Regions:
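A short acidic/small-residue loop/turn micro-motif
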Residues: 42, 81, 154-156
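Short consensus segments that form the blades of beta-propeller domains
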Residues: 89-91
């Protein structure tokens, strides 16, 4: 049995090197909306270490919540901390990750990213076999180096034909 009362994924938290630059990227390039800011947060005791697993002298300059259409919210953190690593993990590293955005028109979305100077990794790949047949995907890199992805499967994926559970699907129209 899983978490009692689980309703879904609420948000994804990301630490960025420059909150304002990351916000411009998420708002102007991706299309998210700023909802609210909080912070700064600093503690003279071990609260940061106990509650967030970071150096106890860490300072969160600001935390910003973004809404991205009808998916989970994005929580951006900007820390001021002495032991911060400037390079995130690769996808192949333990803890590696990427953030994926569903788009209705893959070609238009890729052209939009490239038009904003975003590094797109290769060309979109359409899966033609297996349970994920029907998905079109491509990775891209945020200005601070984080790997992100575009996906599109307007006709669904092959696994859905006989599945007891269907993965997240975009709403007919996102706001």
């Amino acid at each position: 049995m899983g978490l009692p009362g689980l309703a879904g994924a609420d948000h994804v938290g990301l630490t960025v090197p420059d909150l304002e630059a990351a916000t411009r990227f998420f708002v102007e390039v991706i299309g998210c909306k700023v909802v609210f800011d909080v912070g700064p947060f600093i503690s003279d005791d071990d609260w940061m270490e106990k509650h967030l697993g970071v150096d106890p002298r860490s300072k969160i300059n600001k935390l910003r919540m973004l809404k991205c259409a009808n998916g989970p919210s994005i929580e951006l953190f900007e820390y001021d901390v002495k032991d911060q690593k400037a390079v995130g993990p690769k996808n192949s590293d333990i803890g590696g990750h990427h953030l994926s955005f569903y788009v209705a028109d893959m070609n238009a979305a890729v052209a939009h990213l490239r038009g904003h100077g975003v590094q797109v990794l290769g060309e979109p790949t359409l899966m033609n076999e297996g349970p994920s047949a029907g998905i079109n995907w491509v990775y891209f890199t945020a200005p601070w180096g984080m790997t992100m992805e575009l996906v599109s499967y307007p006709r669904g994926m092959a696994y859905e034909a006989n599945a007891k559970e269907i993965l997240w699907r975009p709403a007919a129209s996102a706001s």
